[in-house]
Design a protein with these regions (language model features):
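Amphipathic alpha-helical recognition patches that constitute DNA-binding helices
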Residues: 16, 23, 47, 51, ...
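Residue-level signature of the cytosolic catalytic core of signaling kinases
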Residues: 17, 88, 129, 224-226
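Structured, solvent-exposed hinge/loop segments at the ends of secondary-structure elements
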Residues: 49-179, 185-192, 246-247, 251-262
Length: 288
């Protein structure tokens, strides 16, 4: 008895579905133009929805690929109500990094990338290349925790060292190991660069670019307070309070010696500091 009721129910549903489909196609035949417009409208709406969701996901996960992204901060200078700037001078960055044991590592990146012209020699044959490069201090590999496929987080410690993204290493050296290879500058006055490491490419939604990272000269603007041309990032210990780090620096840094006797942190016409977490950098506006 139960099986009979079950099969009758299935047959009824099948008849209902056939009726719905018959009516649907009947409407399509009678109102072709309206039906086509409705289908097109739904298709466009679906595509627009998918594009919006892809953009939302791209922005929401920006810089989230970096390990401990929430512990990485960019140090910004705030000019009262006039806005802020993300470029720092090297001696200021050095003083800030050394101001607290809560800061595990700090690094500088030049405010822009540059194109480098170089060649490699293989069996007496030269092959020339032009690739983008970013001049950085060695700590960048530890602050951002590069996923090193060859080499280590100390790969930029020596002068003239470079690390390459995996895609660039394969482009230049194929399946051979890139470590130890020389990139000879087209400028005869410049020393050759030595590949000391290869890192896994960053995703597109990352503040870091898939370029050659070159080790900054230890002498470059080392004590130059007038050269503000670097992005400055620090990595704090897990669970550390950024407000505590800033307060500690302001209390112990001799700002009057660096900026003048009338300097006071946070005054309307003076300077203040801000630590912007790495995932928030993408969304921050009004920053020079």
């Amino acid at each position: 008895m139960l099986f009979g009721i079950f099969f009758v129910s299935i047959e009824a549903k099948q008849l209902d579905m056939k009726t719905i489909l018959r009516n649907f196609f009947s409407v399509l035949r009678r109102f072709k133009t309206a039906s086509v417009l409705n289908v097109l409208g739904l298709s466009i709406a679906f595509v627009a929805f998918m594009l919006i969701m892809m953009q939302v996901n791209y922005d929401y996960t920006f810089d989230r690929s970096h390990r401990n992204a929430d512990a990485i901060f960019r140090v910004d200078i705030v000019h009262g109500s006039k806005g802020s700037q993300a470029i720092i001078c090297r001696p200021f960055a050095r003083a800030f990094t050394g101001s607290s044991p809560l800061i595990e590592e700090g690094c500088l990146l030049s405010a822009w990338t540059e194109s480098r012209f170089f060649y490699i020699e293989d069996g007496g044959q030269r092959t020339s290349y032009k690739e983008d490069a970013w001049n950085v201090t060695p700590g960048v590999l530890e602050v951002f925790r590069f996923d090193m496929l060859e080499g280590s987080e100390r790969s930029l410690d020596e002068p003239n060292s470079v690390v390459l993204p995996e895609s660039m290493a394969r482009k230049i050296f194929g399946d051979e190991s890139a470590v130890g290879k020389q990139l000879i500058s087209a400028n005869p006055m410049e020393d050759a660069k030595i590949v000391k490491g290869v890192y896994k490419d960053f995703p597109r939604n990352s503040a870091l670019k898939n370029v050659m990272y070159t080790s900054m000269s230890p002498k470059e603007n080392y004590d130059n307070w007038g050269n503000w041309n670097y992005f400055f990032f620090v990595r704090l210990g897990k669970g550390m309070d950024k407000a505590e780090v800033l307060d500690n620096f302001k209390r112990n840094f001799n700002a009057k010696e660096a900026f003048g006797n009338e300097f006071e942190w946070g005054e309307e016409n003076s300077l203040d500091l801000r630590l912007t977490s790495l995932p928030d950098v993408h969304f921050l506006s009004n920053v020079d």
